[in-house]
Protein backbone atom coordinates (compact mmCIF):
# COMPACT_ATOMS: atom_id res chain seq x y z
CA UNK A 1 0.00 0.00 0.00
CA UNK A 2 1.27 3.46 -0.81
CA UNK A 3 1.86 5.55 2.32
CA UNK A 4 0.54 9.02 2.91
CA UNK A 5 3.84 10.29 4.24
CA UNK A 6 6.91 10.58 2.08
CA UNK A 7 9.61 9.93 4.64
CA UNK A 8 12.35 11.55 2.61
CA UNK A 9 10.61 14.90 2.88
CA UNK A 10 9.46 14.85 6.49
CA UNK A 11 12.10 17.35 7.50
CA UNK A 12 10.88 20.05 5.13
CA UNK A 13 7.82 21.11 7.09
CA UNK A 14 9.10 23.91 9.32
CA UNK A 15 12.24 25.26 7.70
CA UNK A 16 10.86 28.59 6.51
CA UNK A 17 12.65 30.40 9.30
CA UNK A 18 15.99 28.81 8.50
CA UNK A 19 16.83 30.49 5.21
CA UNK A 20 19.56 32.63 6.77
CA UNK A 21 21.63 29.50 7.33
CA UNK A 22 24.77 28.99 5.25
CA UNK A 23 27.85 26.83 5.10
CA UNK A 24 29.84 29.54 6.86
CA UNK A 25 30.27 29.27 10.68
CA UNK A 26 29.15 32.86 11.15
CA UNK A 27 27.71 35.70 9.11
CA UNK A 28 30.14 38.03 7.35
CA UNK A 29 29.49 41.37 5.65
CA UNK A 30 28.65 41.09 1.97
CA UNK A 31 28.11 43.56 -0.84
CA UNK A 32 24.53 44.51 -1.71
CA UNK A 33 22.92 41.98 -4.01
CA UNK A 34 22.45 42.87 -7.65
CA UNK A 35 20.94 41.17 -10.65
CA UNK A 36 23.26 39.87 -13.34
CA UNK A 37 22.47 42.98 -15.38
CA UNK A 38 23.82 45.14 -12.53
CA UNK A 39 20.47 46.48 -11.34
CA UNK A 40 19.29 46.12 -7.73
CA UNK A 41 16.54 43.52 -7.23
CA UNK A 42 13.04 44.93 -7.15
CA UNK A 43 11.33 41.64 -6.30
CA UNK A 44 12.20 38.15 -5.10
CA UNK A 45 11.60 35.48 -7.72
CA UNK A 46 12.00 31.92 -6.46
CA UNK A 47 11.82 28.59 -8.21
CA UNK A 48 9.20 27.03 -5.96
CA UNK A 49 10.31 23.90 -4.15
CA UNK A 50 8.39 22.95 -1.02
CA UNK A 51 8.03 19.17 -0.86
CA UNK A 52 6.18 19.25 2.47
CA UNK A 53 3.41 21.25 0.79
CA UNK A 54 3.48 19.10 -2.33
CA UNK A 55 5.12 21.85 -4.38
CA UNK A 56 7.78 20.19 -6.52
CA UNK A 57 8.56 20.08 -10.23
CA UNK A 58 6.60 17.37 -12.01
CA UNK A 59 7.31 14.63 -13.00
CA UNK A 60 9.78 13.94 -10.22
CA UNK A 61 11.54 10.87 -8.83
CA UNK A 62 10.90 12.18 -5.32
CA UNK A 63 7.48 10.60 -5.88
CA UNK A 64 9.17 7.20 -5.84
CA UNK A 65 10.16 7.77 -2.21
CA UNK A 66 8.73 5.07 0.03
CA UNK A 67 7.76 2.78 -2.86
CA UNK A 68 7.46 -0.89 -2.00
CA UNK A 69 7.20 -2.27 -5.54
CA UNK A 70 9.10 0.26 -7.72
CA UNK A 71 5.93 2.11 -8.71
CA UNK A 72 5.16 5.78 -8.08
CA UNK A 73 4.18 6.69 -4.53
CA UNK A 74 2.19 9.91 -4.87
CA UNK A 75 0.47 10.74 -1.55
CA UNK A 76 -3.26 9.99 -1.88
CA UNK A 77 -6.19 9.92 0.54
CA UNK A 78 -7.49 6.49 -0.52
CA UNK A 79 -5.08 4.14 -2.33
CA UNK A 80 -8.01 1.95 -3.39
CA UNK A 81 -9.91 4.74 -5.20
CA UNK A 82 -8.90 4.23 -8.82
CA UNK A 83 -11.26 6.98 -9.93
CA UNK A 84 -8.52 9.29 -8.62
CA UNK A 85 -5.98 9.75 -11.45
CA UNK A 86 -3.15 9.95 -8.91
CA UNK A 87 -4.06 6.50 -7.59
CA UNK A 88 -3.94 5.19 -11.15
CA UNK A 89 -0.52 6.80 -11.62
CA UNK A 90 0.69 4.97 -8.54
CA UNK A 91 0.33 1.70 -10.45
CA UNK A 92 2.97 2.84 -12.97
CA UNK A 93 6.71 2.21 -12.76
CA UNK A 94 7.64 5.65 -14.05
CA UNK A 95 6.41 8.73 -15.85
CA UNK A 96 5.14 9.45 -19.35
CA UNK A 97 7.79 9.72 -22.09
CA UNK A 98 5.75 12.36 -23.95
CA UNK A 99 3.90 14.47 -21.38
CA UNK A 100 5.21 18.01 -20.69
CA UNK A 101 7.09 18.70 -17.46
CA UNK A 102 6.27 21.72 -15.32
CA UNK A 103 7.72 23.75 -12.49
CA UNK A 104 6.44 26.95 -10.92
CA UNK A 105 7.88 30.26 -9.78
CA UNK A 106 6.78 32.70 -7.09
CA UNK A 107 6.91 36.05 -8.83
CA UNK A 108 6.88 39.32 -6.87
CA UNK A 109 3.67 41.35 -6.87
CA UNK A 110 5.35 44.26 -8.65
CA UNK A 111 6.15 42.18 -11.70
CA UNK A 112 4.08 40.66 -14.46
CA UNK A 113 5.59 37.21 -14.67
CA UNK A 114 8.59 35.43 -16.08
CA UNK A 115 10.37 36.79 -19.13
CA UNK A 116 9.80 34.18 -21.82
CA UNK A 117 12.97 35.06 -23.72
CA UNK A 118 15.08 33.97 -20.73
CA UNK A 119 13.83 30.40 -21.11
CA UNK A 120 16.50 29.19 -23.49
CA UNK A 121 19.27 26.67 -24.09
CA UNK A 122 21.48 28.38 -21.49
CA UNK A 123 18.96 28.49 -18.64
CA UNK A 124 16.93 25.30 -19.13
CA UNK A 125 19.13 22.23 -19.51
CA UNK A 126 17.98 18.61 -19.73
CA UNK A 127 20.29 15.61 -19.48
CA UNK A 128 19.91 11.86 -19.76
CA UNK A 129 21.53 10.52 -16.59
CA UNK A 130 22.44 7.28 -14.87
CA UNK A 131 21.34 6.59 -11.29
CA UNK A 132 22.48 4.50 -8.36
CA UNK A 133 19.16 2.64 -8.67
CA UNK A 134 15.43 3.35 -9.02
CA UNK A 135 14.82 6.81 -7.54
CA UNK A 136 18.46 7.09 -6.46
CA UNK A 137 21.17 9.70 -6.88
CA UNK A 138 22.73 10.71 -10.18
CA UNK A 139 25.99 8.92 -10.99
CA UNK A 140 26.73 10.50 -14.36
CA UNK A 141 25.52 12.25 -17.49
CA UNK A 142 24.90 10.06 -20.53
CA UNK A 143 24.11 12.89 -22.93
CA UNK A 144 22.53 16.32 -23.07
CA UNK A 145 19.22 16.76 -24.84
CA UNK A 146 19.21 19.52 -27.46
CA UNK A 147 17.03 22.56 -26.83
CA UNK A 148 14.77 23.09 -29.83
CA UNK A 149 15.41 19.57 -31.13
CA UNK A 150 14.59 17.19 -28.29
CA UNK A 151 12.57 19.64 -26.18
CA UNK A 152 11.53 23.25 -25.78
CA UNK A 153 10.86 25.37 -22.70
CA UNK A 154 8.10 27.95 -22.59
CA UNK A 155 5.61 29.61 -20.32
CA UNK A 156 2.68 27.29 -19.69
CA UNK A 157 -0.37 28.13 -21.77
CA UNK A 158 -2.67 27.09 -18.92
CA UNK A 159 -1.22 29.55 -16.37
CA UNK A 160 -2.28 33.12 -17.15
CA UNK A 161 -0.02 34.49 -14.39
CA UNK A 162 3.14 33.53 -16.28
CA UNK A 163 4.54 31.71 -13.26
CA UNK A 164 4.74 28.20 -14.68
CA UNK A 165 7.51 26.91 -16.91
CA UNK A 166 6.75 23.96 -19.18
CA UNK A 167 9.38 21.66 -20.64
CA UNK A 168 7.83 19.98 -23.67
CA UNK A 169 9.44 16.92 -25.31
CA UNK A 170 9.53 17.27 -29.09
CA UNK A 171 10.09 13.55 -29.53
CA UNK A 172 9.28 10.62 -27.23
CA UNK A 173 11.81 9.98 -24.48
CA UNK A 174 13.26 6.49 -24.11
CA UNK A 175 11.45 4.06 -21.82
CA UNK A 176 12.92 3.22 -18.40
CA UNK A 177 15.39 6.07 -18.74
CA UNK A 178 16.23 8.84 -16.28
CA UNK A 179 16.43 12.51 -17.19
CA UNK A 180 17.59 15.50 -15.14
CA UNK A 181 16.39 19.08 -15.58
CA UNK A 182 18.60 21.93 -14.38
CA UNK A 183 17.35 25.54 -14.26
CA UNK A 184 19.70 28.47 -13.69
CA UNK A 185 19.69 32.05 -12.44
CA UNK A 186 19.57 33.33 -16.02
CA UNK A 187 15.78 32.98 -15.83
CA UNK A 188 14.32 36.37 -14.90
CA UNK A 189 11.02 38.12 -14.49
CA UNK A 190 10.03 40.97 -16.80
CA UNK A 191 11.75 43.46 -14.49
CA UNK A 192 15.08 41.68 -14.86
CA UNK A 193 15.13 40.08 -11.41
CA UNK A 194 17.06 36.81 -11.48
CA UNK A 195 15.31 33.70 -10.21
CA UNK A 196 16.67 32.23 -6.97
CA UNK A 197 16.35 28.90 -5.14
CA UNK A 198 13.52 28.28 -2.71
CA UNK A 199 14.44 27.78 0.96
CA UNK A 200 14.37 23.99 0.91
CA UNK A 201 16.41 23.75 -2.26
CA UNK A 202 18.87 26.32 -0.89
CA UNK A 203 19.50 24.11 2.13
CA UNK A 204 19.67 20.97 -0.02
CA UNK A 205 22.46 22.58 -2.10
CA UNK A 206 24.80 22.70 0.89
CA UNK A 207 27.97 20.67 0.54
CA UNK A 208 28.34 20.02 4.27
CA UNK A 209 26.17 17.43 6.02
CA UNK A 210 23.16 18.73 7.93
CA UNK A 211 23.66 16.18 10.72
CA UNK A 212 26.56 14.56 12.51
CA UNK A 213 27.19 10.86 11.86
CA UNK A 214 24.60 10.45 9.08
CA UNK A 215 23.55 7.01 7.92
CA UNK A 216 24.79 5.96 4.44
CA UNK A 217 21.43 6.91 2.93
CA UNK A 218 21.37 10.23 4.77
CA UNK A 219 19.06 9.39 7.65
CA UNK A 220 19.81 9.99 11.32
CA UNK A 221 21.55 7.60 13.65
CA UNK A 222 21.70 8.14 17.39
CA UNK A 223 23.23 10.26 18.80
CA UNK A 224 23.48 12.44 15.67
CA UNK A 225 22.63 16.12 15.98
CA UNK A 226 21.99 18.98 13.57
CA UNK A 227 25.11 20.77 12.34
CA UNK A 228 23.15 24.01 11.99
CA UNK A 229 21.94 25.78 15.14
CA UNK A 230 18.98 27.21 13.21
CA UNK A 231 17.84 23.81 11.93
CA UNK A 232 16.16 21.45 14.44
CA UNK A 233 17.48 17.90 14.51
CA UNK A 234 14.26 16.37 13.15
CA UNK A 235 14.31 18.70 10.16
CA UNK A 236 18.01 18.19 9.54
CA UNK A 237 17.49 14.42 9.62
CA UNK A 238 14.69 14.64 7.09
CA UNK A 239 16.58 17.00 4.79
CA UNK A 240 19.88 15.13 4.71
CA UNK A 241 18.70 12.45 2.20
CA UNK A 242 17.36 15.26 -0.02
CA UNK A 243 20.71 17.05 0.27
CA UNK A 244 22.52 13.93 -0.91
CA UNK A 245 20.22 13.62 -3.93
CA UNK A 246 20.51 17.32 -4.78
CA UNK A 247 24.28 17.29 -4.51
CA UNK A 248 24.41 14.36 -6.92
CA UNK A 249 22.48 16.57 -9.37
CA UNK A 250 24.87 19.47 -8.87
CA UNK A 251 27.98 17.35 -9.34
CA UNK A 252 26.57 15.99 -12.60
CA UNK A 253 25.58 19.50 -13.73
CA UNK A 254 29.05 20.81 -12.93
CA UNK A 255 30.53 18.13 -15.18
CA UNK A 256 28.68 19.84 -18.03
CA UNK A 257 29.85 23.35 -17.13
CA UNK A 258 26.99 24.53 -14.90
CA UNK A 259 28.32 26.24 -11.75
CA UNK A 260 26.68 25.09 -8.52
CA UNK A 261 25.84 28.66 -7.53
CA UNK A 262 23.91 29.21 -10.77
CA UNK A 263 21.43 26.37 -10.18
CA UNK A 264 18.04 27.44 -8.82
CA UNK A 265 16.31 24.06 -9.00
CA UNK A 266 17.01 20.60 -10.37
CA UNK A 267 15.10 17.36 -10.47
CA UNK A 268 15.19 13.89 -11.97
CA UNK A 269 12.42 11.83 -13.52
CA UNK A 270 12.42 8.28 -14.84
CA UNK A 271 10.16 7.23 -17.70
CA UNK A 272 7.83 4.28 -17.36
CA UNK A 273 8.34 0.91 -19.01
CA UNK A 274 6.57 0.46 -22.35
CA UNK A 275 7.51 -2.93 -23.76
CA UNK A 276 8.39 -5.31 -20.86
CA UNK A 277 4.80 -6.34 -20.09
CA UNK A 278 3.84 -6.94 -23.73
CA UNK A 279 7.14 -8.73 -24.31
CA UNK A 280 6.44 -10.97 -21.31
CA UNK A 281 2.96 -11.78 -22.65
CA UNK A 282 4.33 -12.50 -26.10
CA UNK A 283 6.89 -14.89 -24.64
CA UNK A 284 4.10 -17.04 -23.18
CA UNK A 285 1.69 -17.01 -26.12
CA UNK A 286 1.73 -19.99 -28.46
CA UNK A 287 0.12 -20.30 -31.92
CA UNK A 288 -3.56 -21.18 -31.73
CA UNK A 289 -5.66 -23.05 -34.25
CA UNK A 290 -8.28 -21.05 -36.13
CA UNK A 291 -11.56 -22.58 -37.24
CA UNK A 292 -12.75 -21.00 -40.51
CA UNK A 293 -15.74 -21.76 -42.73
CA UNK A 294 -16.91 -20.17 -46.00
CA UNK A 295 -19.95 -17.91 -45.85
CA UNK A 296 -20.77 -18.30 -49.54
CA UNK A 297 -20.58 -14.50 -49.82
CA UNK A 298 -18.25 -12.32 -51.83
CA UNK A 299 -17.25 -8.76 -51.05
CA UNK A 300 -19.98 -7.49 -53.36
CA UNK A 301 -22.63 -9.44 -51.47
CA UNK A 302 -21.52 -7.68 -48.30
CA UNK A 303 -21.27 -4.27 -49.96
CA UNK A 304 -22.69 -3.60 -53.41
CA UNK A 305 -20.03 -0.97 -54.05
CA UNK A 306 -17.24 -3.54 -53.85
CA UNK A 307 -16.15 -5.89 -56.67
CA UNK A 308 -16.80 -9.62 -56.12
CA UNK A 309 -13.11 -10.52 -56.21
CA UNK A 310 -12.72 -12.08 -52.75
CA UNK A 311 -14.65 -14.71 -50.81
CA UNK A 312 -15.57 -14.11 -47.17
CA UNK A 313 -14.86 -16.65 -44.44
CA UNK A 314 -15.79 -16.46 -40.77
CA UNK A 315 -14.49 -18.38 -37.81
CA UNK A 316 -13.16 -18.28 -34.28
CA UNK A 317 -9.94 -18.45 -32.32
CA UNK A 318 -9.34 -19.08 -28.61
CA UNK A 319 -7.39 -16.23 -27.00
CA UNK A 320 -6.01 -15.64 -23.49
CA UNK A 321 -7.89 -12.86 -21.68
CA UNK A 322 -6.28 -10.82 -18.93
CA UNK A 323 -9.34 -8.89 -17.70
CA UNK A 324 -12.42 -10.01 -15.82
CA UNK A 325 -15.32 -10.93 -18.10
CA UNK A 326 -19.09 -10.84 -17.51
CA UNK A 327 -19.13 -14.55 -18.27
CA UNK A 328 -16.99 -15.24 -15.18
CA UNK A 329 -18.85 -16.61 -12.18
CA UNK A 330 -20.45 -13.91 -10.06
CA UNK A 331 -19.50 -11.02 -12.35
CA UNK A 332 -21.89 -8.33 -13.56
CA UNK A 333 -21.75 -6.75 -17.05
CA UNK A 334 -20.13 -3.56 -15.71
CA UNK A 335 -17.04 -5.54 -14.71
CA UNK A 336 -15.65 -4.92 -18.20
CA UNK A 337 -15.19 -1.24 -17.31
CA UNK A 338 -13.75 -1.72 -13.83
CA UNK A 339 -10.79 -4.07 -14.11
CA UNK A 340 -7.28 -3.93 -15.48
CA UNK A 341 -4.35 -6.25 -16.02
CA UNK A 342 -2.69 -7.45 -12.84
CA UNK A 343 0.41 -9.46 -12.04
CA UNK A 344 0.68 -12.43 -9.73
CA UNK A 345 1.40 -11.09 -6.21
CA UNK A 346 5.10 -10.59 -5.63
CA UNK A 347 6.18 -12.54 -8.73
CA UNK A 348 9.27 -10.43 -9.36
CA UNK A 349 11.83 -11.49 -11.92
CA UNK A 350 15.60 -11.50 -11.19
CA UNK A 351 17.30 -9.44 -9.92
CA UNK A 352 14.27 -7.69 -8.43
CA UNK A 353 13.16 -10.82 -6.57
CA UNK A 354 16.10 -10.17 -4.24
CA UNK A 355 15.18 -6.53 -3.54
CA UNK A 356 12.78 -7.22 -0.67
CA UNK A 357 9.84 -5.73 -2.54
CA UNK A 358 6.20 -6.07 -1.49
CA UNK A 359 5.05 -9.71 -1.66
CA UNK A 360 1.44 -8.62 -2.17
CA UNK A 361 1.77 -6.07 -4.98
CA UNK A 362 -0.03 -6.95 -8.21
CA UNK A 363 1.09 -3.89 -10.19
CA UNK A 364 2.54 -4.75 -13.60
CA UNK A 365 6.03 -3.29 -13.88
CA UNK A 366 9.40 -4.02 -15.44
CA UNK A 367 10.11 -5.95 -12.22
CA UNK A 368 6.88 -7.99 -12.31
CA UNK A 369 5.86 -7.98 -15.98
CA UNK A 370 3.66 -11.04 -16.52
CA UNK A 371 -0.11 -10.53 -16.18
CA UNK A 372 -2.40 -13.20 -14.81
CA UNK A 373 -4.60 -14.88 -17.41
CA UNK A 374 -8.19 -14.61 -16.14
CA UNK A 375 -9.84 -16.74 -18.81
CA UNK A 376 -9.72 -18.02 -22.38
CA UNK A 377 -12.21 -16.36 -24.70
CA UNK A 378 -13.39 -17.70 -28.05
CA UNK A 379 -13.61 -14.68 -30.34
CA UNK A 380 -14.74 -14.04 -33.94
CA UNK A 381 -12.40 -14.01 -36.93
CA UNK A 382 -13.09 -12.51 -40.37
CA UNK A 383 -11.10 -13.58 -43.44
CA UNK A 384 -11.22 -12.62 -47.12
CA UNK A 385 -9.45 -14.68 -49.80
CA UNK A 386 -8.95 -13.71 -53.48
CA UNK A 387 -11.17 -15.75 -55.80
CA UNK A 388 -11.09 -16.45 -59.53
CA UNK A 389 -12.63 -13.07 -60.29
CA UNK A 390 -9.50 -11.43 -58.90
CA UNK A 391 -7.54 -12.99 -61.79
CA UNK A 392 -4.86 -13.90 -59.28
CA UNK A 393 -3.34 -17.37 -58.92
CA UNK A 394 -2.85 -18.86 -55.48
CA UNK A 395 0.89 -19.29 -54.80
CA UNK A 396 2.14 -22.77 -53.97
CA UNK A 397 2.88 -21.65 -50.41
CA UNK A 398 -0.59 -20.14 -50.02
CA UNK A 399 -1.92 -16.61 -50.21
CA UNK A 400 0.18 -13.98 -48.42
CA UNK A 401 -1.85 -12.56 -45.54
CA UNK A 402 -2.43 -8.99 -44.40
CA UNK A 403 -3.50 -8.59 -40.76
CA UNK A 404 -6.00 -5.75 -40.50
CA UNK A 405 -6.36 -3.78 -37.25
CA UNK A 406 -9.42 -1.57 -36.95
CA UNK A 407 -9.53 1.75 -35.11
CA UNK A 408 -11.01 2.53 -31.70
CA UNK A 409 -14.86 2.33 -31.68
CA UNK A 410 -14.84 0.35 -34.96
CA UNK A 411 -14.81 -3.43 -35.59
CA UNK A 412 -13.32 -6.22 -37.71
CA UNK A 413 -15.81 -5.76 -40.55
CA UNK A 414 -13.96 -2.58 -41.57
CA UNK A 415 -11.46 -4.95 -43.17
CA UNK A 416 -13.97 -5.54 -45.97
CA UNK A 417 -13.51 -1.97 -47.20
CA UNK A 418 -9.87 -2.59 -48.10
CA UNK A 419 -10.08 -6.29 -48.89
CA UNK A 420 -10.82 -5.71 -52.59
CA UNK A 421 -7.67 -3.63 -53.02
CA UNK A 422 -5.57 -6.35 -51.44
CA UNK A 423 -7.36 -9.13 -53.32
CA UNK A 424 -6.53 -7.40 -56.60
CA UNK A 425 -2.86 -7.68 -55.58
CA UNK A 426 -3.15 -11.29 -54.46
CA UNK A 427 -3.43 -10.88 -50.70
CA UNK A 428 -5.81 -12.44 -48.19
CA UNK A 429 -6.97 -10.21 -45.30
CA UNK A 430 -7.69 -11.41 -41.76
CA UNK A 431 -9.09 -9.40 -38.85
CA UNK A 432 -10.18 -9.74 -35.23
CA UNK A 433 -11.54 -7.10 -32.87
CA UNK A 434 -9.79 -5.05 -30.25
CA UNK A 435 -10.75 -5.99 -26.68
CA UNK A 436 -14.21 -4.64 -25.79
CA UNK A 437 -14.97 -4.06 -29.48
CA UNK A 438 -17.08 -6.01 -31.94
CA UNK A 439 -20.11 -5.97 -34.24
CA UNK A 440 -23.04 -4.64 -32.23
CA UNK A 441 -25.69 -4.68 -34.99
CA UNK A 442 -27.71 -7.83 -34.31
CA UNK A 443 -28.90 -7.85 -37.95
CA UNK A 444 -25.37 -7.93 -39.36
CA UNK A 445 -24.80 -11.38 -40.90
CA UNK A 446 -21.27 -11.41 -39.51
CA UNK A 447 -22.37 -10.82 -35.91
CA UNK A 448 -21.31 -13.98 -34.12
CA UNK A 449 -24.87 -14.42 -32.79
CA UNK A 450 -25.99 -15.11 -36.35
CA UNK A 451 -23.56 -17.98 -36.85
CA UNK A 452 -23.29 -21.55 -35.55
CA UNK A 453 -20.25 -20.47 -33.54
CA UNK A 454 -22.45 -18.69 -31.01
CA UNK A 455 -23.95 -21.97 -29.84
CA UNK A 456 -20.41 -23.29 -29.41
CA UNK A 457 -19.56 -20.49 -26.97
CA UNK A 458 -18.10 -17.78 -29.19
CA UNK A 459 -18.97 -14.18 -28.26
CA UNK A 460 -18.40 -10.74 -29.64
CA UNK A 461 -15.57 -9.07 -27.73
CA UNK A 462 -18.09 -6.56 -26.35
CA UNK A 463 -19.65 -9.48 -24.41
CA UNK A 464 -22.90 -7.91 -25.67
CA UNK A 465 -22.55 -5.24 -22.99
CA UNK A 466 -23.63 -1.70 -23.89
CA UNK A 467 -20.33 0.08 -23.29
CA UNK A 468 -21.62 3.48 -24.45
CA UNK A 469 -24.73 4.04 -22.38
CA UNK A 470 -23.74 2.21 -19.20
Which residues does each PLM region occupy?
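Bacterial N-terminal signal peptides that target proteins for export
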Residues: 1-8
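Residue-level signal for mature regions of secreted extracellular proteins and peptides
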Residues: 11-12, 230
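C-terminal motif of bacterial Sec signal peptides marking the signal peptidase cleavage site
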Residues: 14-17
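Acidic, low-complexity Ser/Thr/Gly/Pro-rich repeat segments typical of extracellular/periplasmic
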Residues: 21-334, 340
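Residue-level signal for short segments within beta-strands and strand-turn junctions
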Residues: 126-130, 385, 405
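Accessory recognition modules or surfaces
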Residues: 150-164, 170-172, 190-206, 378-401, ...
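N-terminal cap/lid segment of alpha/beta-hydrolase-fold proteins
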Residues: 301-397
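Cap/lid segment of the alpha/beta-hydrolase catalytic domain
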Residues: 347, 351-377, 393-470
